[in-house]
Design a protein with these regions (language model features):
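Active-site and donor-binding regions of nucleotide-sugar-utilizing enzymes
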Residues: 3-97
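Donor nucleotide-activated moiety binding/catalytic core segment of transferases
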Residues: 21-35, 228, 233-278, 284
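Structural motif
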Residues: 38-39, 179, 221, 270
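A donor-sugar binding/catalytic signature common to diverse glycosyltransferases
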Residues: 39-54, 257-303
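A short helix->loop->beta-strand "cap" motif at the edges of active sites that frequently abuts
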Residues: 59-64, 220, 286-287
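Active-site-proximal region of nucleotide-activated glycan assembly enzymes
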Residues: 65-159
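Leloir-type glycosyltransferase catalytic cores
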Residues: 90-133, 301-362
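Conserved catalytic-core segment of nucleotide-activated headgroup transferases in glycan assembly
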Residues: 135-239
């Protein structure tokens, strides 16, 4: 389906169906369009077009698949039936993962994907903006315009390239005292909008800092890590600094852009997330995790189930054996080795997806 100029520029084969009516008409036309295909595939759960598909899952004759970035990154992508993340069909209790772990799959590392990801996102937004007149009924579901996001991505990526690495090194941070890490998500991320009591990163940070200021040990610091793909339209660094000052803990709170997540997980006392999949990396390093939103991995044995106020002084690490069984099950059920943006591993991802669809036919 081609809904905008960026879709048209990206689709280089015959057979693309150009659709120019708005999302309300799309919802009405969907059943007829889906009647001629076996499978409908959407990327993510955001936007009125994808939401129309997901709201009609039970009524559609075609199977519905949802693609998303990998739960275990960077070497995997996610594909599930009917929903991902908070709508995932994966079990949410430890008893479902009691069976011995499956043998680990052979994985082809995807390498460094951030430059490719930023370039693809930026080019897509540019094409969408330049061709907007040709698709007047297309509705952008992002909280900020595509052009603003494009400029923000490029500016932020260039800034990271020239910023001293030492300000983001786990060793440098740990030398200042024990710390907890908070992982932010992209502004406007569907996980924030659909699967959280907090409307945005600012509300999530306010609640986290309220608890940290009142209940964390006085020698502990809080390291707030920005999402690597946040477009930088909202200055989360400035907001974090203001929230910390307002609560009297500015001298114990650091904001970092970039940094090696694995090293930070190893060095930290624990991680707090809204529902970011960064938590899965932390769990793999036996790092205690507290989830404040709705996540398929938030259950007893994996994440800390105590209130946040107690987490600061009594962080509980995951059951290591349970995590290995959980990871093996999730990879077998929903993960495909490869990447959407790294050119060398795109064919690998495509082959894996085709194989999963064929297995579903069997």
């Amino acid at each position: 389906m081609i809904f905008n100029a960026a879709d048209a520029a990206s689709w280089r084969r015959a057979g693309g169906l150009i659709y120019k009516p708005g999302p309300e008409q799309w919802a009405a036309d969907l059943a007829g369009i889906a009647g001629g295909v076996t499978d409908l595939i959407v990327f993510g759960e955001g936007g009125p077009y994808n939401r129309a598909v997901l709201s009609q899952v039970e009524a559609l004759a075609a199977r519905v698949w949802v693609l998303e970035n990998g739960y275990f990154r960077p070497d995997w992508i996610t594909v599930e039936r009917n929903g991902v993340n908070g709508s995932s069909g994966l079990p949410r209790f430890r008893g479902a993962y009691a069976a011995p772990a499956l043998p680990p799959p052979v994985v082809q590392p995807v390498g460094r994907i951030l430059p490719h990801h930023v370039a693809n996102i930026s080019l897509y937004h540019i094409a969408e903006a330049l061709g907007a007149a040709a698709f007047p009924n297309f509705v952008v579901h992002y909280p900020h315009s595509p052009l603003k996001q494009c400029i923000g991505h490029v500016r932020r990526y260039l800034g990271l390239a020239f910023r001293p690495r030492r300000t983001r090194d786990a060793e440098q941070i740990a030398a200042r005292g024990p710390f907890f890490i908070v992982c932010l998500q992209r502004e406007g991320d569907m996980q924030l909008l659909r699967y959280s009591q907090y409307a945005d990163n600012s509300a999530f940070m306010a609640a986290t800092l309220d608890s940290f200021a009142r209940h964390a040990p006085g020698d502990c610091r809080l390291v707030v890590k920005n999402h690597p793909l946040d477009p930088g339209v909202v200055s989360l660094r400035r907001i974090t600094r203001w929230l910390a000052m307002e609560r009297g803990v500015a001298d114990r709170v650091d904001f970092i852009d970039g940094g090696h997540l694995n090293e930070l997980c190893r060095a930290s006392r624990g991680m707090v997330v809204n529902n970011s999949s960064a938590a899965l990396s932390a769990l793999g390093f036996h790092t205690p995790v507290k989830v404040l939103g709705d996540a398929f991995f938030d259950f007893e044995g994996l994440t800390d189930q105590k209130p946040l106020d107690r987490f600061w002084s009594e962080p509980t690490p995951p059951d290591e054996a349970l995590f290995h069984r959980f990871r093996a099950h999730v990879i077998a059920a929903s993960q495909i080795n490869g990447n959407y943006h790294e050119p060398r591993t795109q064919p690998l991802a495509a082959e894996g997806l085709a194989d999963m669809f064929e297995r579903a036919d069997g």
